[in-house]
Amino acid sequence: MKVIDLAKSQQPAEYIEGTEWDRVTQDYIRQYKKILDAEQCRTIIAAANYGRWEEVTHNDTRMCDVSVITSRALDKILFGAFGGMLKLYASDFWRAASMNTDTGYTVVRYSPSDHCPIHHEPVGSGIRAMINLSECDGGELQFFGKEKVDSSVGTGTIFPSSFMFPYEILPVTEGYRYYVSTNFK
């Protein structure tokens, strides 16, 4: 998995140790540290907590809560962050440059014991992008049942969901994990 710290200019790509053999994660999954700063993350969480949450279930099992971003000011911040991630991603994968529509921004809240089981997006769903907004115990994004991504606040992850990469959100053990996500088509 390629990890890029946006606070450090002109740095070589770093790969997470122990994943060198797996070309799928090395070649297509990218993480961008500090795509949002901590204050922006707190603002997004506060706005979502002020709004309306909807419970998400799968087969009668609770998974998480979601809230849609409706504020123009937050939309502008997220448009810049996700657009920046897509631009950086397209510099590595030119086909991503053809993605010109996002699906809006959804804040996802995982409470203690909440999780999203391993799954993949349907073929043709484009590119999936997520930004971690909070620190907590558990709730990490994991690919292929074994490779966790950096879960520091403000880190964005982007990958081609059309490749059907199996991913999951691990159970939260303490606190709340917030992500904001979108899909590019």
Feature locations, PLM:
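Non-heme Fe(II)/2-oxoglutarate
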Residues: 2-99
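Catalytic core of non-heme Fe(II) oxygenases with the double-stranded beta-helix
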Residues: 79, 83-185
